[in-house]
């Protein structure tokens, strides 16, 4: 009987006006694909995220799930492949540690990234791994959260987090582990913001927040910046972006009017 396990981390350290997001400088990642030297079948080689068809499968699966959520989303960004996130994910998978990477190993430029892990005793398809994460939807109530204190929903909420639009994944064969196949996906910017996990997106008419930037129900007007504080909208209104403090700490609010962030 095949065994599957999964794990999730997608926590952006999020604080309000009293504090800041804690981060470190981005560490340049080197693509280091890992393939076992002996005895590995073609099914594993076919999972390599260096393959364009695999990248397309992963991105399309995520976008299909994102546009199909209930209630429908008005501000869900369309995901796209990111080579830096993929390199970070592959580097971490290659370590075969079966735990989550450090925050500094989950960054793309200035963005913090979330992370989903999936472990299997056989080379499952990427679509199956992603669907396994998404299936936590059955334990989730929109605007409420998990149906029970024990329910795990973090994989699902990361997949459907409205502002996470960059994705990169990697897979490794770990012969010393009982579950020998480790799948890692990283999502940027990270979802599962503390205090907001029960509302991973705004409900409403698909693309209601981006009527002029819509691709089959998903928004394409992403923002290249992030805000440091959760109340940047009110800070901008009160002090305006002429303030050095607001300009420095509320870059999305000041530079991304009309965009999703």
PLM-predicted stretches and their roles:
Residues 2-261:
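Mature extracellular or exoplasmic CAP/SCP-family domains and secreted bioactive peptides
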């Amino acid at each position: 009987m095949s065994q599957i396990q999964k794990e999730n981390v997608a926590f952006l350290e999020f604080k309000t006006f009293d504090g800041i997001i804690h981060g470190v400088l981005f560490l340049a990642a080197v693509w280091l694909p890992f393939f076992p030297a002996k005895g590995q079948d073609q099914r594993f080689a076919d999972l390599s995220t260096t393959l364009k068809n695999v990248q397309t499968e992963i991105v399309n699966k995520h976008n299909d799930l994102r546009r199909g959520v209930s209630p429908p989303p008005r501000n869900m960004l369309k995901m796209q492949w990111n080579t830096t996130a993929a390199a970070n994910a592959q580097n971490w998978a290659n370590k075969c540690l079966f735990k989550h990477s450090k925050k500094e190993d989950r960054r793309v430029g200035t963005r913090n990234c979330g992370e989903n892990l999936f472990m299997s005793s056989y080379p499952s398809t990427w679509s199956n791994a992603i669907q396994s994460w998404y299936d936590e939807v059955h334990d989730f109530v929109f605007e409420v959260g998990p149906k029970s204190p024990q329910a795990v929903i973090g994989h699902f909420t990361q997949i459907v987090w409205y502002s996470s639009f960059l994705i990169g994944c990697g897979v490794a064969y770990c012969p010393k582990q009982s579950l020998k196949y480790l799948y890692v996906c990283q999502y940027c910017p990270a979802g599962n913001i503390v205090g907001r996990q029960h509302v991973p997106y705004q409900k409403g008419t698909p693309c209601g927040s981006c009527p002029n930037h819509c691709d089959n129900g998903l928004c394409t007007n992403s923002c290249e910046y992030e805000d440091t504080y959760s109340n940047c909208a009110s800070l901008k209104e009160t002090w305006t972006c002429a303030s050095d403090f607001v300009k420095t700490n509320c870059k999305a609010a000041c530079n991304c009017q009309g965009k999703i962030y």
